[in-house]
Each structure stands twice: as structure tokens, then as C-alpha cells.
Curated annotation (Swiss-Prot):
Lineage: Eukaryota, Viridiplantae, Streptophyta, Embryophyta, Tracheophyta
Coiled coil: none
InterPro entries assigned to the protein according to its UniProt record, in alphabetical order: Domain_X, Maturase_MatK, Maturase_MatK_N
Main location: plastid
Protein name: Maturase K
């Protein structure tokens, strides 16, 4: 393993990935924890990777390619009618083998970036702090920055219309031409295998669900290119070469240093310098803040509305020039921060102005002074969460609780545990809300849905069921989060959960978005 790593460090430009796929000793990589993990050190269960898919399974598939020529038979049968029982087994084989290839390719293409990531942390001496990975850590930082900004822009990063665009982005990082051709061939055949089940508009969506590891690698490389289009004008227009932007680009761009950008980026820089030579003066705004999660980004500025429109115009043009497909300008919304609430990471964030009148007295003269202070507020998006609950069949669209029929076959303790876990996760994730009334409503819907599910199981009404077992049956797991909060806060601070509607608590152990929030 050490010899292989030294070989990779010695010469990264050599085409090692594609031969590595068929090398006998390479399958030991599947058992190496240093290269098996994802680029962001997330555990396997976080992204929902299938533990059954590994290079060991890929090895078996490669052996079958040579022995029984399965791959050619599957490709030849891809255009035939799969509803015939004779070809049903071949279609099942193609689906399983496509996942094996996807998992194996994802592990292989992550190797150079994983090594580069580890060497970057060692060179920069950056500690691997888990607190910095928390989603909640974004809000305290944003609170101090957004108080002094004027405009905010919501940016929706679209999915590429063709999977070939994702492979094309890798050309500037991976010089292994056979691997890129193999990846294109695999994506093309994968589309043919599933063409009778899915439409072209949903092909990327289905691919992202069935091949999570490979898709997220390709999608992250695509998003990093999108962020490069945002960072570059900011770097060129800033008065000083801020180190934070260099660190940002290195972190999000798989740690490719700015002075060592690939040839494709150098071409873009030359074009952009000629394009922005007469207009870069209008982008000189030292107060630009950018944050992104998945496909949504927020860009805030202290500049005027005209400045934000110029950013939008140039970003759209760079996007269309670089990715060669149309970008709808309506995906970027520009609003004044004081009159707008933007949805991000499961919260509705806004900037409120509080007016305060202060009486000042100087000697015998007194006068009144009006002051205006800004306050960053985050609230629970009740409408969005109710929509997620209705999709999951916990309530109606209007928020009326209903029973969960598919859980009625479970035991009473299992039903209560599942509903209780959902309530605790929501309370944990939305603990930073300024107003808890919306969270109480969501918990009430889940509580009554749990009671209706139990009553449905016992073929009784909710009132009769609660009267027989007592209303305290559902109290324990709904108040567990409040008991934890009372232990966390200092004893000297009086704290009552139901009375502290504006108490905000940010946790530093949340590394993924809540499932209900993610589907809202």
C-alpha cells in the first residue's frame, strides 16, 4: 500500500486509474480506510452508501467479463424488449453490475484527491475540527456578518442537462484518457439500460439515487467549477489578495492551488481578464459573503442593487460560456436584506430593524434620541415542514394530523420510538429558532399522528385510546429534548422551555440536514 501511494505521489499525470481497475493487487484498496472514505471524511452511513458494493464485488464482475462475457451480452440486450421473461435476468444483472462499476469507479477517482487532501492538511497544519463541520456553525458566523449588509442574492445551481458535462469537467484534473472514455461509455450505457423506465429529464435524478458515491463526486466537481466562476471576479476586483479566498478555493476546489490551476482554468482567466478589463472597477466591494449548501447558495453584499445586478449579469454570462448550456436568470433573486426572508438550511432567515428611543440628559437639558438596531432572526418554516409531513403521510396539506398506516403493524413501543425520534431530531435541528411556536405546532402534529396510528392499530378512537392508557403516554419522549436543554444551560440562568420562545441554541454536532427539511 505504501509503495502504491509513493507511486501516485511520484507522478500524478500518468494514466494509473484505468489500469488500476484491472490490477490484481489494487483490490486491497477496498480494505484500506485511508482511501475508502469520502473526500470530506464522512462516515459511510451518512451518505447512505451501500456497504455491499465494493471493489471486491467489482473484481468478481471483471473476472466474469473475461470468463463469460456478461458485459457484451448485457449491452447487446439493452435495445431489446425487457418485458420478455427471457431477458429479465439480464436486465437484473445489468442493474447490479452498473452499481458495482459505479462504486468501483467512485473509489478509484477519489484516490488522487484523497491523497491531495491529506497532504494539504499536513502542509497547512489545519486541525480536523469537527465543530467547524457543523451546519449550525454557519448561523453564528452569518449573524455577525449580515447585520451590516444591504442586499442578498439567492442562487439556485441547476443540475447539468447531460451527464457528459460532469465527465468533461474532470478532464482538467484527471489526465487518464482511457478512464474518461470508460466513464462516458458507462454513463451512456446506463442511460440505455434505464431508457424504458425513466424519461431524459429524470435520468440524472435516478442516477443520483442509485449511484450516490459516483454522482456526488461528479456533482461536487461540477459545483466547485460553479464556485470558481464566483470567486474569480471577486479575486480580480478586490483591493487586496485576501488569503481567505485562497483557502476557500483550495478547500472547495479539491485543494488545487490558485497558482497551479490547470490549462482549462488558465484559458478562462485570460478570457475573463480581457472581458472584465473595463468593468472590474464596478465590482470593488470588500463586503461580499458567500455560503452554499447542496444546490443553493446565498451571496450577500453591502453594495447597491446595481452592483448585485452586475454580478448577476456577469455570472450568468460566464456560466453559459463555460458550461455551454443555458442558465435561466430567474434562478438568481436579488432582494434588499431588510425586507426579505431567505430560506436556507431549513431556516427562514431575515434581518429585523428594532427602533429604540433613548432619553439623554446633559446638565439641565434633556432630549430624545431614536436609534435603530438590526437583529438577525431565524424561524422555523412551518409551511415547508407541513408540506414535508404531508408528503410523508403524517398530515394533510392543511396540517391536519392523520395516521401512518404502514406503521400500524409495528409494536406500540416501536411506533412511539419512531415518532419520538422524529420530534427529538426536529427539536435538535431547529433549536436555533428565534420563535418556538412553529416548532410546537409541528410537534403537535406528530404527537396526534402518533396517537391516531396507535388508535388505528388497536381499532379504537383517539379519545378512547388516550383515556384508557392516560394522556401521559406520549409526554415522556416529547419532553426529553427539553430536559436535555435544562441540563446544558447553567444553573444560574433561569430557563423554562415553554417560556423561552426566543432562546436560541446552536449545536456543533449536526453534520447533515434533517430529512424533513431536506425534502421541503
Amino acid at each position: 500500500m505504501e509503495e502504491l501511494q509513493g507511486y501516485l505521489e511520484k507522478d500524478r499525470s500518468r494514466p494509473f486509474l484505468y489500469p488500476l481497475l484491472f490490477x490484481e493487487y489494487s483490490y486491497a484498496l477496498a480494505h484500506d480506510r485511508g482511501l475508502k472514505g469520502s473526500l470530506f471524511y464522512e462516515p459511510t452511513e451518512v451518505f447512505g452508501y451501500d456497504s455491499k458494493s465494493s471493489l471486491a464485488l467489482l473484481k468478481r464482475f471483471v473476472i466474469r467479463i473475461y470468463q463469460q462475457n456478461y458485459f457484451l451480452s448485457v449491452v447487446n440486450d439493452s435495445n431489446k424488449n425487457r418485458f420478455v421473461s427471457h431477458h429479465h435476468n439480464n436486465f437484473x444483472y445489468s442493474h447490479x453490475y452498473s452499481q458495482m462499476i459505479s462504486e468501483g469507479c467512485a473509489i478509484l477517482v477519489e484516490i488522487p484527491f484523497s491523497l491531495r487532501l491529506x497532504s494539504y492538511f499536513e502542509k497547512k497544519e489545519i486541525p480536523k475540527s469537527h465543530n467547524l463541520r457543523s451546519i449550525h456553525s454557519i448561523f453564528p458566523l452569518s449573524e455577525g456578518x449580515l447585520l451590516h449588509l444591504x442586499h442578498v442574492s439567492d442562487i439556485l445551481i441547476p443540475h447539468p442537462i447531460h451527464m457528459g458535462i460532469l465527465v468533461q469537467i474532470l478532464q482538467c484534473w484527471i489526465q487518464d484518457v482511457p478512464l474518461l472514455h470508460f466513464l462516458r461509455f458507462f454513463l451512456h450505457k446506463y442511460h440505455n439500460w434505464n431508457s424504458f423506465l425513466i424519461t431524459p429529464k429524470k435520468s440524472i435524478y435516478v442516477f443520483s439515487k442509485e449511484n450516490k458515491r459516483l454522482f456526488w463526486f461528479l456533482y461536487n466537481s461540477y459545483v466547485s467549477e460553479c464556485e470558481f466562476l464566483l470567486v474569480f471576479p471577486r479575486k480580480q476586483s478586490s483591493y487586496l489578495r485576501l488569503t481567505s479566498f485562497g483557502l476557500f478555493l483550495e478547500r472547495r476546489h479539491f485543494h488545487v492551488k490558485m497558482e497551479h490551476l490547470q490549462m482549462q482554468h488558465l484559458i478562462l482567466i485570460v478570457v475573463c481578464r480581457d472581458y472584465f478589463q473595463g468593468t472590474l472597477w464596478s465590482f470593488k466591494d470588500p463586503f461580499m459573503h458567500y455560503v452554499r449548501c447542496q444546490g443553493k447558495a446565498v451571496l450577500a453584499s453591502k453594495g447597491t442593487h446595481l452592483l448585485m445586478k452586475k454580478w448577476k449579469y456577469n455570472f450568468v454570462n460566464l456560466w453559459q460560456y463555460y458550461f455551454h448550456f443555458w442558465y435561466q436568470s430567474y434562478r438568481i433573486h436579488i432582494n434588499q436584506l431588510s425586507n426579505y426572508s431567505f430560506y436556507f438550511l431549513g431556516y427562514l432567515s431575515s434581518l429585523l430593524k428594532n427602533s429604540l428611543t433613548v432619553r439623554n440628559q446633559m446638565l439641565e437639558n434633556s432630549f430624545l434620541m431614536d436609534t435603530v438596531t438590526n437583529k438577525f432572526e431565524t424561524i422555523v418554516p412551518v409551511i415547508f415542514l407541513i408540506g414535508s409531513l404531508s408528503k410523508a403521510q403524517f398530515c394533510t396539506v392543511s396540517g391536519h394530523p392523520i395516521s401512518k398506516p404502514i406503521w400500524a403493524d409495528l409494536s406500540d413501543s416501536e411506533i412511539i420510538e419512531r415518532f419520538g425520534r422524529m420530534c427529538r431530531n426536529l427539536s435538535h435541528y431547529h433549536s436555533g429558532s428565534s420563535k418556538k411556536q412553529g416548532l410546537y405546532r409541528i410537534k403537535y402534529i406528530l404527537r396526534l399522528s402518533c396517537a391516531r396510528t396507535l388508535a388505528r392499530k388497536h381499532k379504537s378512537t383517539v379519545r378512547t385510546f388516550l383515556r384508557r392508557l392516560g394522556s401521559g403516554l406520549l409526554e415522556e419522549f416529547f419532553t426529553e429534548e427539553e430536559q436535555v436543554l435544562s441540563l446544558i444551560l447553567p444553573k444560574t440562568i433561569p430557563f423554562t422551555f415553554y417560556g423561552s420562545h426566543k432562546e436560541r441554541i446552536w449545536y456543533l454536532d449536526i453534520i447533515r440536514i434533517n430529512d424533513l427539511v431536506n425534502h421541503s
